[in-house]
Regions:
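Short, small-residue-biased leader/transition segments that mark boundaries at the very start
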Residues: 3-4
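Short microdomains enriched in Cys/His and/or Lys/Arg
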Residues: 51-66
Length: 230
């Protein structure tokens, strides 16, 4: 019950949102368009430290979360977010990705002993949700890139075929030289970058939305979707 509710959100049967008990629950900044803005303004934070005081070690809890994924018959897509996935320390992120990889291996091996029509869905896509390529592009350091490369190499061998960083550039003004450098590094590590854009009337009137799409496409970033929040 509580273990899954706090760390795992489900909106679609084949997708799971994983929110770790780490600094990944926090954000690198506060976005005006955030779906949780109403909660933030009411002082209900996603990272309420009193509420999040651990009742068991994170390693033990992480094992339980992976068991939940392993026993799920439909799961194909895990989105690690928060907060912000890249707010977690490299060591924490490495451990999470290692746990995801081992879970995918166990699930695949278990399917070898299941009859046709009774096999569980296997993991196909892993996503990291982060706005740090915008806010703090220097977070994309050599150690992080090695973690991403290593995970992709191992996970590709067990059927995972999509590796994505989902970020949130809102205007071409945010695509700084530092952000461009971070984008190139992530792409060179073999991960795809997608951008989620919240439609903003003021920015659109000034042509920022159209220009942002052109700039990101030119850098190899896929404009994943544009959404409108009320």
């Amino acid at each position: 019950g509580d273990v899954y509710k706090r760390q795992i959100h489900r909106r679609y049967p084949d997708v799971a949102i994983l929110i770790p008990d780490s600094m990944g629950r926090a954000c690198g900044g506060l976005c005006a368009s955030c779906q949780r803005m109403y909660d933030f303004q009411s002082e209900r934070l996603n990272f309420n430290f009193e509420e999040l005081k651990p009742k068991e070690s994170w390693d033990k809890r992480l094992r339980k979360l992976m068991e939940y994924f392993e026993n799920d018959t439909q799961l194909r897509d895990i989105l690690i977010t928060g907060g912000d996935a890249l707010m977690s320390q490299n060591k924490t992120l490495r451990n999470i990705l290692k746990a995801v990889y081992k879970m995918a291996v166990r699930k695949r091996n278990a399917n070898l002993h299941r009859a046709e029509g009774e096999k569980y869905a296997e993991l196909q896509r892993v996503r990291l949700g982060s706005r740090l390529p915008v806010y703090l592009p220097m977070r994309i350091n050599d150690e992080l890139l090695e973690i991403l490369r290593e995970f992709k190499e191992k996970a590709s061998a067990v059927g995972v075929s999509q590796f994505l960083i989902q970020t949130h550039f809102q205007t071409p003004l945010e695509v700084t030289p530092e952000a461009r450098k971070a984008i190139r590094k992530i792409l060179a590590a073999g991960w795809t970058i997608t951008n989620q854009l919240v439609y903003n009337v003021a920015a659109s009137r000034r042509g920022h939305t159209a220009k942002l799409r052109k700039v990101l496409n030119g850098l190899g970033v896929l404009c994943y979707y544009t959404c409108l929040l009320y």
